[in-house]
């Protein structure tokens, strides 16, 4: 801006308003800790869609629930997510089979090895059938082989088109040599590889595989030794659950593979409970995120209630965790079957969808879980009531309405002010928004002018929050108050280098129990 004006004319100048609006922070960023097919280990990676996840961490696997959970997260409306791959390396043993020859001495003919990973190859079948020899050329010998005939190999893999390799031979150098034809990288099989096992000196007739259908076996996937510390990790190395401390934008923590490790014998129940409590402790320490926990598999309502109340004793006084039951059935592309998995990944996606459509103040309940086929357990009304009282959020199937989440409680005590998920997450949102929006205050002169600006900015922000329906009250005076003055900042507080602002908020709470009183009346009667 010029200090003097010499030329006649109109001058338009920008003048700082002094207002620093507080913007709302994101509320739906999930962090997944678990097993994946590939990718960096113990290093957080951000993904925003399923394709990005596949490019970094691979596809679905048989020995982990994390890929299915993340797929369900995106399918249910999830957006940003952090993924931390934990655990040892996956050791894959391909399925294989030796095809027997026709010799009386039981000479093996061919070894068939699956190209599909691990146990997936166990579903491959190989059918051997004899074929007629081609007609003899004019003036020549029979087109059949003098020491053995030709055969057809049909390869069947579930969910794929059969592969047929006809007129095969075991004669070395033959254009239709079985090993060369099937193993051809361009025109050969996509499911198997062959290896000639017969020693030299054995006739073709004896080496030719016996005609029948064979099924491959022995395929498996296993993980090298896993200990709870692999899941828990530490902040310094940015590994495991503790490594999430370095990620400021995380609002949900999900670890479904704790249950997979338990099922596979890599963790005992004590280890499972210890890790779930470690996640709760992490969320309580960070005060800006909520843990979405899973119940163990195969438990009926009575068993899961006893487990939660007597065995696990999962409690979060500040409401920084939520527990869901039962497991859900989904399609598993890795096994090409339906499987039961922990619901936490799908739940995280539903939380995100609810935030996006209604706001973080809306309880993430009475909303449909997408991509879910069935439930491991169907609950009665009495069972639902008992579990709800003990802060176990249930998932129910409703005729004509799909499979829905039917609970919105945290792991806080029933009488706690942090009983509801939406209240806890609304306060997290408001706290983080004010924290980030008032960073400019640090080292400003601590006087009444500063207090007034802080009151103004926070009041404007909370007025917008109230306008979305997140706060209870017909007016802003009923919905909240902001106090930052001489009373909250006496001389001893100022001398200590502090500025104190007191904020009171009246959050909306869900209508958990809807009660209609209906009675008979006499026609024509008045109240």
Residue ranges, per PLM feature:
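Extended, Lys/Arg-rich, non-catalytic nucleic-acid recognition/anchoring regions
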Residues: 106-197
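Short, solvent-exposed coil/turn linker segments
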Residues: 49, 137, 169, 177, ...
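Acidic/proline-rich low-complexity IDRs
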Residues: 96-98, 167, 193-196, 203, ...
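Long, low-complexity, polar/charged, intrinsically disordered or flexibly structured peripheral segments
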Residues: 198-237
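Structured, hydrophobic secondary-structure cores that serve as assembly/anchoring elements
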Residues: 1-117, 142-161, 203, 212, ...
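Generic detector of low-complexity/intrinsically disordered segments
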Residues: 99-101, 112, 170-172, 196-199, ...
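Generic structural signal for beta-strand residues in well-ordered domains
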Residues: 25, 144-146, 172, 176-187, ...
């Amino acid at each position: 801006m010029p200090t003097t004006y010499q030329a006649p004319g109109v001058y338009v100048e920008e003048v700082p308003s002094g207002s620093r609006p507080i913007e709302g922070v994101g509320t739906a960023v999930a962090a997944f800790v678990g097993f994946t097919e590939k990718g960096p280990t113990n290093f957080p990676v951000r993904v925003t869609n399923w394709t990005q996840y596949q490019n970094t961490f691979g596809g679905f696997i048989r020995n982990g629930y994390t890929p299915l959970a993340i797929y369900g997260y995106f399918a249910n409306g999830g957006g940003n997510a952090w993924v931390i791959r934990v655990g040892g390396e996956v050791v894959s043993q391909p399925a294989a089979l030796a095809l027997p020859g026709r010799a009386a001495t039981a000479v093996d003919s061919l070894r068939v090895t699956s190209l599909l990973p691990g146990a997936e190859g166990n579903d491959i079948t190989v059918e051997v059938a004899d074929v007629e020899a081609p007609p003899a050329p004019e003036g020549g010998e029979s087109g059949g082989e003098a020491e053995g005939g030709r055969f057809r190999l049909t390869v069947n893999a579930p969910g794929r088109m059969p592969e047929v390799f006809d007129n095969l031979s075991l004669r070395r150098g033959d254009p239709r040599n079985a090993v060369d034809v099937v193993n051809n990288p361009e025109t050969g099989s996509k499911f198997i590889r062959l290896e000639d096992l017969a020693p030299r000196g054995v006739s073709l007739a004896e080496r030719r595989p016996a005609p029948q259908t064979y099924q491959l076996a022995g395929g498996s996937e296993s993980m090298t030794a896993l200990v709870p510390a692999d899941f828990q990790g530490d902040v310094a190395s940015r590994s495991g659950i503790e490594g999430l401390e370095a990620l400021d934008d995380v609002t949900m923590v999900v670890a479904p593979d704790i249950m997979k490790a338990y099922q596979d014998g890599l963790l005992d129940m004590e280890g499972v409970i210890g890790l779930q409590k470690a996640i709760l402790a992490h969320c309580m320490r960070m005060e800006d995120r909520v843990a979405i926990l899973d119940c163990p598999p195969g438990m009926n309502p009575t068993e899961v209630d006893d487990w939660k109340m007597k065995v696990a004793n999962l409690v979060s006084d500040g409401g920084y965790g939520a527990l869901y039951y039962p497991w859900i059935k989904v399609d598993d592309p890795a096994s090409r079957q339906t499987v039961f998995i922990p619901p936490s990944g799908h739940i995280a996606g539903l939380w995100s969808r609810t935030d996006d459509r209604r706001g973080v103040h809306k309880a993430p309940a009475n909303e449909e879980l997408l991509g879910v086929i069935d439930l491991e357990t169907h609950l009665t009304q009495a069972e639902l009531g008992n579990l709800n009282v003990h802060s176990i959020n249930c998932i129910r199937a409703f005729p004509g309405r799909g499979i829905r989440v039917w609970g919105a409680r945290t792991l806080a005590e029933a009488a706690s002010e942090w009983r509801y998920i939406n209240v806890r997450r609304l306060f997290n949102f408001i706290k983080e928004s004010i924290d980030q929006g008032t960073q400019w205050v640090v080292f400003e002169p601590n006087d009444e002018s500063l207090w007034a600006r802080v009151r103004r900015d926070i009041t404007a922000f909370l007025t917008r929050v109230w306008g979305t329906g997140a706060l209870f009250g017909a007016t802003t005076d009923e919905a909240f108050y902001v106090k930052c003055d001489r009373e909250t900042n006496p001389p001893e507080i100022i001398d200590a280098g502090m500025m104190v602002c007191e904020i009171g908020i009246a959050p909306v709470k869900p209508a958990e129990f809807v009660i209609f009183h209906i009675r008979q009346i006499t026609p024509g009667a008045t109240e």
